[in-house]
């Protein structure tokens, strides 16, 4: 079984597929526990007043908040993956997550300014998802969200429409772009 993830701030669509690209499981998972900001750098530490709930926080306070959020994301992701493993009929061998730059900054003062503050929280989710998969012994694949569906279609050839769009007819809604992206990521990883 291969798992593909299309994540957002605080939640993700997860699709599990068999070796011949049949959808075995699809679900929405929560990636953060309640009561914490889903995008701490963008919404709490960023430069935009409209996103901040209160006065700006300094770097040490933001770093502490990011650490707390990251720990929460790790717990929630681990619990969601435990539920997924229990639900699928065969072992999971790989996890595909959206790609992120290997050289993405880690310094909180750098992360809170453009161009990094708008991407920092997303990178955190990608990193935590990958860490949780690695901890389970899954092979980790990264995909380009803008290209993965086209890459999967090229791999599938004449089967592309049936495989990528067919699950909506077979499984019913929801079957959104996120579902197709996650499924396509499992195909490209195969």
Predicted ranges, named:
Residues 1-190:
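Phosphate- and other anionic-substrate recognition elements at nucleic-acid/protein interfaces
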């Amino acid at each position: 079984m291969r798992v593909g993830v299309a994540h957002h701030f605080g939640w993700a669509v997860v699709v599990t597929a068999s070796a011949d690209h049949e959808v075995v499981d699809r679900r929405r998972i929560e990636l953060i526990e309640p009561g914490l900001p889903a995008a701490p750098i963008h919404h709490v530490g960023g430069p935009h007043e409209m996103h901040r709930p209160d006065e700006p926080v300094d770097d040490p306070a933001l770093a502490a908040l990011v650490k707390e959020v990251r720990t929460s994301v790790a717990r929630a992701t681990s619990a969601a993956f435990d539920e997924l493993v229990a639900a699928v009929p065969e072992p999971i061998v790989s996890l595909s997550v959206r790609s992120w730059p290997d050289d993405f900054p880690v310094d909180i003062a750098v992360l809170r300014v453009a161009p990094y503050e708008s991407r920092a929280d997303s990178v955190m989710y990608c990193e935590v998802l990958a860490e949780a998969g690695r901890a389970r012994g899954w092979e980790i694949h990264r995909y380009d969200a803008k290209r993965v569906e086209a890459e999967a279609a090229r791999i599938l050839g004449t089967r592309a429409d049936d495989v990528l769009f067919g699950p909506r007819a077979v499984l019913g809604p929801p079957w959104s772009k996120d579902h197709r992206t996650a499924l396509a990521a499992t195909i490209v990883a195969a």
